[in-house]
Amino acid sequence: MLGNGLDILYNLDIYFHPRTNQSAGFIEGINHVRIVNNTKDELKQLYFHNASNYSASKAPLTEISEVRCSHTGHISGQDSLVLKIGLFPAVKQGETVIIDIPFKTFFTSSGNPHLPAYGARKDTTTYNAINFYPVLEYYYTDGWHPELYTKSIKPYTQFAQYKVDLTIPKDFMVGVSGNVIKQNELETGHLKYSFKDDFTLSCSALIVQGMHKTELNISGVQVEIIAPKTQTKRVQKTAEHLQALIPFYEQRFGNALMDKLVIGIGYSLGTHAVTNGNYIIFQGHIDIEHVLDHEMAHQWFDYSIQADEYRDVWLNESFAEYASWLFAQSQKDEADPFTFTDPLPDINIWSDIKTMDTEDWTRFLMDVIGEKSLPPVYQPGKQINWETVANIYSKYIVGNHALQNLQATVGDSVMRNIMFNYCLLFKGKTTNTEDFIVVVEQHSEKEIADNFRLALTTNISPDLEIKNVDSQFKHRQWHNQIITSFEGSWIMPVDILIITENGDSTLLKQVDIKTNKTINLATSSPAVSVILDPRKKLFDDNRFNNRWPRRVSLQPDYGLPSWETYKVYYRPKLKRDWRGNWRTGVKFSGGLGINLMPIMPAFYQNLFDFEITFSIGVPKHNWGGKINYRTPLESTANTFWELEKGYEYPKKWTKLSFNNYFGEPKYLAVQGESYYSRLTSTISSTEYIASDSSAWWTTGQSVKLKEKWTIFSYSATQRYLVETHLLYGFQEEVSFYNFGISADVETHKFEGFIIRLHSEAGFVWDERAGNELDYRLLYVPKVWQQREGRIPLFRGVASDEKEWHDNILSGGVSVGFETEAAAWPMVYIDGAIISDKKGTLLERIDQLNRSDKVYISAGIGLESQTIMEIGLYFPVWVSHPVGGEDNFTLRMLMQWGFYF
C-alpha cells in the first residue's frame, strides 16, 4: 500500500506564548495547507492528525477554530485525534485544494513523548514543540484508511514541503528543524524566524531559556547543539562524536534528507530521547553513547526512508540498531561482529523508571538480564493484543541479528552494497520488508533472500550436532576429522571450539558448515571435546523465533524473567495455612513468561506453580500441596484462565478462574500510567473430609461462584486499587453469600512523603453450622501495591484467629518519610468496627453504626524500597481485642521483585 500522488505544502504562521501564572504555555497560528491531487482518484475527503487530542477522556490540548477550505464540505473531529474534512466538489486529478486550519496547542508536562512538552530545572526552561499542528494523514495507493489513523498518537504522514514563520519572545532561544532564511526583530520585542524544508516528514522546534547554542558544520549538515552551560564538556564530546558518526553513516548509507540537525535538552519528555526529522531531543542530558548513535540512524531509517506501515517497526528500529552496531564496530581496534550479549552490568535505573518508554525498557532488559530474556516473535500461533509489544521487542532485536547474520553470509562488501543501494533507491519514499528483500536478492542470490525472510518470520531451529570425531596420529601430529550435521534451511557461519587431551584449545571462527560439513584440524594431542557454536550465537538468533524453548533449567527463584529456556524456579516455603498452622516445603514455578506488572505488560504462556508442604504442628495427615496452571484463552484477546487444585487435610479444593480485562490495559513503560479494569469469575469446589472440634467447618462439599471486579492504577506519583466482590455458594441445599468492597490509595505527590489510605466493608450471610465463610481479622498492612496475586492486601486489624464476625467496617491511614532506600518511619493507625447481627444489608450497616466492638491499632514500621522488599511493623493496641496478639509483636513481610 505504498503512498504516492499528493504534493503537499504546509505554510505555517505561528506564535509562541510562554507559560505564565495565568495560563500554560502554548503555540498558536494558522496552518495553510496546499494539496495537489496527482492521483487517478478523486479526493472526497481529507484526514488530519492532531496528536495532542489523542485522549477522548481528557480535554483536548489542541483547539481548532473555524476551518476554511476551497472545497467546503462537512468538517468533524476538531477535538479528536483525527480531523475529517469533506470536500465538495471532489478534487479531481491535477486539481488543487487549499485549507486553512487555525489552531492553538498547549504544552504539557504529562511525560508523553509524542506531545509538545514543557519543563523547567534550576535556571533553564524548555518547550519541545513537536506534533503541535494538524498534519495530513498518510494516503495509500488504494485511498484513505481511517481505521488505521487512530491506532497511534504519533503522526504517520507523507513527505511534504514546509515554509514556516515562527515568532517568539526576544528573551528565548530557538532551534528549528528547517533552514532559517530570515530573522527579524519586531518592535513588540519579539523575534521572527522564517525557515523552510523542501522535503521532510515533520516540523519541530526547541524553544529554551538559560541554555547555550553550539553551531558547527559536519559534511554539509548544519548542526546546532542546545544545552545548559553546565554541560559544556558533554557538548564538546557530542560534537567530536558527531564528527565521526555522521560521515560514517553517509559513507555506509548515502546522504539522508538532513541538511540541518538540532540536538537539544528537554524536560518532561516521557522517554530518554525524542526524534523527529532533523531533530533529536534528550531528557536532561545528551547520551553520547549508543542512544545517540541509534537516534541519529533514524534520520536515515524513519525520516529519509519511511515504512509503508506504521506498525512495521523492524524497518526503523532494527535498521537503527544495525547502523549503531556498525559504527561501534568501526571504533574498535578489532571488530567482533557477532557478539550479541554483554556481561551483566552494574547499573541503577530505578530513579529513571518514570521516564522510560518501550524502547528504553528494551534496552534496559538487554543490559540487565541479557538478550536471552526478551520475548520472541510468536510465529506461528495466536496473536493476542498484549503480545503486540512483544513483537516490537523481538523485531527490534531479531531484525538487527538477521542483518548481522546476512552480513556474515554475503560478506562485508556485498552487505555494504545492499545497504547503500537500498538507501539510495528508497530515499524520500516509503518501503516495506519485501522491497528490502528484493535488494538483497539483486546483490546475492534468491536462496539467501528467501532465508533472510525466514529468519524474520518463522521458526528456524538448525539443531546443530557433531556426528563423529575421528583422531589419528600421523607424521608426529594428531589429525582430527570432525563431521557435522544440521537441520533447517538456513545455517550461518558457526564457531567451533576444539579441546585436546593436553588441555589446549583452538577456536575456529565463522566456519561455513553448510558447504564444509567435514572439518580437518591438526593438533599436538588427540581431541577430547568439540563444541559447535560454543557461545550460543546461532541459538541466540534462532531463539527469538522459537515459540517453545529447547532446554529446561532448574534454578532458584531470583526474580528475573527469561525466555532463554522453559525455566523452573524453586524456592522454600514457610507459611501459616488456613488453620493457623505453620507449614514448610518447596514451591516450583515455571513457564514461558515475563511479568513486570505494572511497569510492563505480562506476557506469558503456560505458567504453572507446584507446591508441596508439610505441617509442623499436625501429627497426622501433615502433608499437602497444590498445583496452579494459567494461560491465555485461544479465542479471546483479553481473557486468561487459571486452574488450581490443592489438598491440605482435611480440605481439598478445585478452582477455575477467568480473568477478563475490559478495554486495553495501560502500562507505565508505554503510556506513563498502568491501569486495568478486570472482572474475575471463579467457580470452586471445596470438600472437608473431617470436621473441626471448634465448629469452624463441617464435613461435606460446598460449591462457590465468585465475581470480583478490580480497578487498578499506578503512576509515578499515585496509585490506587478498588475491589468489590460477591460470592454465592451452596452446601447440601443451604445457600450462603459474602459481599465486600475495599479501596486503597497511595500517593507520593508530597515530596519526601508516602501517604496511604485504606477502607473496607464486608458482610456475610451464612446459616451453616461452620464459620468458614466469616471474616477472620489479621493485621497485614498493605506494604506494597497489588501485583498480580503476589502482594498481600491490607485487611483490618488483628484479632483472635478463632473469633469470627459477620460484618466489618475498617479503615486506616499511614504516613512515612521516603528516601531512595527506605521509608522510615511509617507511622500508622488502623481501626475496625465489627458486628455479629443478622439481617438485610441496610440493617447490618445500621448495626455497625451502633456496635461497641471497636478495635484500634497504632504503630510504626520500616519499609525498604529496593529490589528486595522488606516491611517490619510493630503494632500497639489502643483498644485491645480479646485474645489478640501482644503489643509490639513483630510483623515482617518480605518479597523479591520490582518495587512499585
Q: What residue spans do the PLM features occupy?
A:
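N-terminal, polar/Ser/Thr-rich
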Residues: 1-28, 449-455, 571-575
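Outer-membrane beta-barrel initiation region
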Residues: 494, 500-506, 510-513, 519-526, ...
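Outer-membrane beta-barrel "beta-signal"
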Residues: 867, 887-900
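Beta-strand-rich binding/interaction modules
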Residues: 448-449, 462-534
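A surface-exposed beta-strand-loop module
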Residues: 54-124, 188-189, 514-525, 542
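Hydrophobic alpha-helical and helix-loop surface patches within well-folded domains
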Residues: 229-482, 530
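Extended, low-hydrophobicity, Ser/Thr/Pro/Gly-biased non-transmembrane segments
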Residues: 102-206
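C-terminal outer-membrane beta-barrel translocator/porin domains of Gram-negative envelope proteins
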Residues: 572, 641-647, 659, 667-820, ...
